[in-house]
Amino acid sequence: MRYNAGSYDIVVIGAGHAGCEAGLAAARMGCKTLVCTLTLDSVAMMPCNPNIGGTAKGHLVREIDALGGEMGVNIDHTFIQSKMLNTSKGPAVHSLRAQADKKKYQERMKKVLETQENLHLRQLEVVSVEVEDGKVKGVLTKNGAFFECKAVIMTSGTYLQSRIIIGDVSYSQGPNGLSNANELSKSLIDLGIDLRRFKTGTPARINKRSVDFSKMIEQPGDEEIIPFSFISGNIDRDQVSCWLTYTNEETHKVIQENIHRSPMYNGSIKGVGPRYCPSIEDKVMRFQDKDRHQIFIEPEGDDTEEMYVGGMSSSLPEDVQVQMIKTVPGLENAEIMRTAYAIEYDCIDPTQLKASLEFKNIDGFFSAGQINGSSGYEEAGAQGIVAGINAALKVQGKDPMILTRSDGYVGVLIDDLITKGTNEPYRMMTSRAEYRLLLRQDNADFRLTEIGHNVGLVTEERWSKFQERKQNLERELERLKELQITNKTENNEKIVELGSTELKKPIRMYELIKRPELDYFSLACLDPERPDLPKDIGDQINIIARYEGYIQTQLEQVAQFKKFEKKVLPEDLDYNDVNSLRIEAIQKLNKIRPLNIGQASRISGVSPADISVLLIFLEHYRKTGKNTDN
């Protein structure tokens, strides 16, 4: 029986990585918030890989943190290994990755939600979102409870009508043996929301006691632990190792002989899988020129024997999985604890969303995370914090926070989803960001903390630490640009000792740092009055000095980009009325409804000629007395 169960400012459906960030952001901004989850035991669960960060994903975690989110703080408290990736490459692609203790990560995040002021965490299944006159009114649960609210954030992950597939066996279930949600999809369809089916998967978990690590290559963590959060401070912790091994011809033979039993190849799986995280059977069949593939054996926590078999995601039958795993060096006697599986689930077409992550046709209804067609904990958390902030701003009667492609990877992620859409689970990569030298993980706070503070999410403690860090960097850069190093013998002897060439004339310290064989730290011997600053300040100075020319070029590109972003397109424009647009462009523009010329130019099917037509139209529109510039 239906009953009125109370009212909230914001209701969040789901408590995965998107839901946690969304709920915390809304509550911390002063909104009375209800976070619903199918089970309290799955809050912030990691159903797949036991780590946070990685290439491009580490950038997202830093950006979540810079805005005032929780993911970075939480992993800093619960990681069991820390590693900086891509250090042999340029600073734009350096990415932090941390191996998580999955249970501790969950437990701490759940505690944060439980103790957060303005936030109520409840075990409930939402079966419908109720809308009246195009505006959210509330949500209804399976038990008949109706919660009135001003905004809803859907963060339902991979649970909507999800189906587990292992070989020729399939059944209705959520990830990791949990129940799924089968009724909410119908409510979304009734609201006119387009759904599609995607697929993802996870590898087996094996018992650590059954692994022969002597046949593998140890992968230890870094000696220097770099935190994810800008407010974590120094961390000193014992770390555990991961291990590297490889598949071989025997592994590939087992897969090839049983490929007809793979649901990916016999048509049992209808959903589209992730291109950049293929199953082991997909890798073997697609890349037959490769005689081996990397397999990483990763611990899932301090208090468990479960080991994650990274790189061996599969939906092959269980008996084939057993054969396959035992062909890998070090896994000859491996005991499977959890079978690998594929999971199909409903998700939305993200082009139905605005840049604020609010549905275009439903006032107050937001969506974030894997339900939007993305993959990964970090992508989900990034969308979650944006949706949470914007739902809170909506309730407060304020304009939304829109992050652009020049603001951060979060902006790139959202712009790609809402502008281009996606036909497969979307994964963030550094190559997707045009301005990646400006969007480094080390400067996420310089880019986003002020924005987080302006919307009311960044705490005064975090703001104070940021201000101090910003002042330290600016003052030190100014000092280095003024500090002159003379070409006296004593200085030249030290410079030669450092592997560089003598000075012919005096030079500013800032210019000296640009020499590839020198850096800020090695030149301390020529700088006796240098202030005692944190190491990360020196790291940033090295990047800013050495890449100054490239950074300036990208800043000029951003200025050009912003010119097009400022040319706003009318919200109610019917593109059928714009003369000379091609039919395909009219269809795409009417569907996506871009905010501005910049976004319009990134829509697949809209040509440069179409953009020229729109610019002419806007000029005429402006001359008739309607302003289209921000």
From Swiss-Prot:
Plastid is among the record's keywords: no
Cofactor dependence: FAD
Chain positions recorded as FAD binding sites: 14-19
Top-rank taxon, per record: Bacteria
Keywords, sorted A to Z: Cytoplasm, FAD, Flavoprotein, NAD, tRNA processing
Pfam families registered for this protein in UniProt: GIDA, GIDA_C_1st, SAM_GIDA_C
Location, primary (coarse class): cytoplasm
SMART domains: GIDA_assoc_3
Family of this protein: Belongs to the MnmG family.
Protein name (database record): tRNA uridine 5-carboxymethylaminomethyl modification enzyme MnmG
